[in-house]
Design a protein with these regions (language model features):
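Active-site beta3 strand of CheY-like receiver
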Residues: 50-56
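Acidic catalytic/metal-coordinating carboxylates
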Residues: 39-42, 53, 65-71, 91, ...
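Two-component/phosphorelay signaling modules centered on CheY-like receiver
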Residues: 16-35, 124
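Short amphipathic alpha-helix used as the core "switch/output" element in two-component signaling
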Residues: 45, 67-80
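Alpha4 helix (beta4-alpha4-beta5 surface) of REC/receiver domains from two-component response regulators
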Residues: 24, 68, 91-108
Length: 131
């Protein structure tokens, strides 16, 4: 992790490109830096390279799901404290509990309000920065 940024950087991990770009643009519109990763492997490369202040993580992705990404994030001491907001169409209590056990800071179900997501991520970034 080498990058230093003036504005907080949010990594959006979403395999649906159109939704991902809308979310990225919402963060940019609110003065945050944001980038889209389309799968879990790309997400881990970006995390290692750019050190995001927060991650918005879809659970249901091809090849490597969000649970796997979350497990890897939490197992690496260099990046284990990055706040992760899980965003998913999965409404089940067991999935929500599992994501929380793996270290998700928040869990948002689709469809969601962009303003609400941005607000939640901003709050996590601020509290993480203060810690």
């Amino acid at each position: 992790m080498t990058a230093r940024r003036k504005r907080p950087f949010v990594l959006v991990v979403e395999d649906d490109a159109s939704l991902g770009e809308v979310v990225v643009q919402a963060f940019r519109d609110e003065g945050l830096d944001a980038r889209l990763a389309r799968d879990g492997d790309e997400a881990m490369r970006v995390v290692d390279e750019l050190a995001p202040a927060a991650i918005v993580l879809d659970l249901m992705m091809p090849r490597r799901d969000g649970f796997s990404v979350l497990r890897e994030l939490r197992s690496d001491g260099r990046i284990a404290r990055i706040p992760v907001v899980v965003v998913t169409a999965i409404f089940g209590l067991s999935e929500r509990m599992y994501a929380t056990e793996l270290g998700a800071a928040d869990y948002v179900t689709k469809p969601f309000e962009l303003d609400d997501l941005v607000s939640r991520v901003r709050a996590l970034v601020a509290s993480h920065k203060a810690a």
